[in-house]
From Swiss-Prot:
This is Ribonuclease 3. Homodimer. Pfam families: dsrm, Ribonucleas_3_3. Residues 156-226 form the DRBM domain. Its main location: cytoplasm. One of its GO terms (cellular component) is cytoplasm. Its cofactor is Mg(2+). It catalyses: Endonucleolytic cleavage to 5'-phosphomonoester. GO terms for molecular function: double-stranded RNA binding; metal ion binding; ribonuclease III activity; rRNA binding. Mg(2+) binds at residues 42, 115, 118.
Amino acid sequence: MEPIKNLPRLCRTLGYEFKNIELLTQALTHRSAANKHNERLEFLGDSILSIVISDALYHQFPKATEGDLSRMRATLVRGDTLTLIAKAFKLGDYLFLGPGELKSGGFRRESILADAVEAIIGAIYLDSDLEVCRKLLLHWYAERLAEIQPGVNQKDAKTLLQEYLQGLKKPLPDYQVINIEGDAHDQTFTVECRIDDLSESVIGVASSRRKAEQIAAAQVLELLKK
C-alpha cells in the first residue's frame, strides 16, 4: 500500500491535480479498508465514462449503426480495458485495502483495479466538472479511440492475440494457471501467458481463470504494439 504522501505523484501520472485530495483518497479506498470507501464514486464514474465515450464515438463515427456504437463502447469501458488503464497508472501501488484483501493480493485483482479507475473518474468530476473529465478521459483514451473501428476490434483479447499470431504463422499462446488463492467462493487466479516473440511470460490476475487469461492476452497485445 502506497503512503499517502505519494498521492501527488499519482496526480501527476493521472494528469489532474486535485483541489480536494480527500476525494482521491476515498476513490482509492476499498470497502474492506474503511466505511468511507469508493463504491459511490465508482457508481458516478461509471456513468460519466459511459457518456463521454458514447459522445466521442457518436461524433467520431457518424455512419456507424447503434449496434456498432454499443459494441465499441462496451469494448472501451469493459473491465479488462479499465484494468489495463489502472496498470498503466500503477494504481495497485496506491490502493487502500483491508488486511484480508491485502494478503490475498487485492492490489492485483482486476475488479478492484477497474472499480478504482471508475471511482477516480467520479472523484475528478466532483472536484471539477464534466468538461474537465471529458478532456482528461479523451486524453486517457486517445490511442484506443484512434484504433477502434466499427465491427473490427470488438473481439476479446484472446481471440485477437490468436488471430494476430496465426496471421504471422507463429505458434499459439500458452496459458498456464500458476496460482489460485482464496476460498472457493472468492478465489483469485494468476495465469501466465507465453508466446515465442516475448522472452518473459506475462501475468494476468482475476477472479476467474478465463478473465485472468483475457487480461494476460490483453497485456501481450499491448507489448506487441510497442
